[in-house]
A protein has these predicted regions:
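Conserved alpha-helix/loop element of class I SAM-dependent methyltransferases that forms part
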Residues: 1-19
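Class I SAM-dependent methyltransferase SAM/SAH-binding core
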Residues: 20-22, 28-87
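Conserved Class I S-adenosyl-L-methionine
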Residues: 28-30, 173-255
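Class I S-adenosylmethionine-dependent transferase superfamily signal
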Residues: 35, 120-121
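A conserved beta-strand element that flanks and buttresses the S-adenosyl-L-methionine
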Residues: 99
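Hydrophobic adenine-recognition pocket in adenosine-nucleotide-binding enzymes
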Residues: 103
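A short, conserved alpha-helix within the catalytic core of class I
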Residues: 106-120
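Conserved catalytic/acceptor-binding region of the Class I
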Residues: 116, 122, 126-194, 212
């Protein structure tokens, strides 16, 4: 769903064979796979979704790959601190690009978690290294925002850090400032969410983890029902589901 975002960032930063990329919250590894296809060495860390990390391993570490290609790819079920041995004393930073593509700005408190990830990655990079963070665009430019409100409504008994909130204009800049990073450019990218039918849309949205609290507060059947109703306005005559969205990215640099 965020492929245009990944492509825009990689093209702007000229990701290639000289790139040593650290992907924070790498999820299913699609962004890492795209970087690896450009020749980059990639490392991904994720402590929140073991099932998605397992998919990343299938994508990035297939047995068919040669030894050299596999050596330039690493996946870790954990936090950036688990890569502390990569810091080394050789004078060469372990990574020269850090990405955190999991977009902030739709769940209250998500930026705090991102700040912790960025802080954990700081010892692994040198000065002036680009750090890319991403966020949802304005609610009026994101059709999916109305669907995400279902998560808030159903998770009301667990109200708090998991509640939906609209993205704010300076979300990314504030995250960078708190992490001690210097903003050095930004952009907006259209990332429409398209699905073959409602069933596929429900499965795809549930896989993001944004509805986990709603499922815990009610049950799977109730969440499915509410999601289908919320998706109805976005269903086309041919049965496909189409939701235009705008995402922002910020490039910041380490001091």
């Amino acid at each position: 769903m965020l492929v245009p975002l990944y492509e825009a960032v990689y093209q702007r930063l000229e990701v290639g064979s000289a790139t040593r990329l650290l992907g924070l919250g790498c999820g299913s590894g699609l962004a890492l796979l795209m970087a690896a296809s450009r020749g980059a060495g990639v490392t991904g860390v994720d402590a929140c979704a073991p099932e998605r990390l397992a998919l990343a391993r299938e994508r990035l570490l297939p047995e068919a790959w040669g030894t050299r290609a596999r050596a330039r790819t690493r996946l870790v079920d954990g936090e950036p601190a688990d890569l502390a041995s990569d810091a080394g004393d050789s004078g060469t930073a372990a990574y020269n690009l850090v990405t955190a593509f999991e977009p902030v700005g739709c769940v209250a408190g998500d930026s705090e978690g991102l700040g912790e990830l960025l802080a954990g990655a700081r010892p692994l990079v040198g000065r002036g290294v680009p750090v890319v963070i991403a966020g949802w665009g304005p609610p009026e430019r994101c059709a999916t925002a109305s669907v995400l409100r279902v998560a808030t409504k159903l998770a009301d008994p667990l109200r708090g850090a998991g509640s939906w909130r609209p993205a704010l204009r300076d979300d990314l800049e504030e995250v960078a400032q708190r992490a001690g990073l210097r903003p050095d450019g930004s952009g907006r990218v259209a990332c429409p969410f398209g699905y073959a039918d409602v069933d596929n849309a429900v499965r795809g949205l549930l896989s993001t983890g944004l509805f986990d609290a709603a499922v815990a507060a009610t049950d799977q059947a109730q969440v499915d029902k509410e999601l289908r109703e919320a998706l109805h306005p976005h269903q086309r005559r041919d049965g496909t589901v189409w939701m235009p969205n705008i995402f922002r990215y910020l490039i910041a640099r380490t001091p």
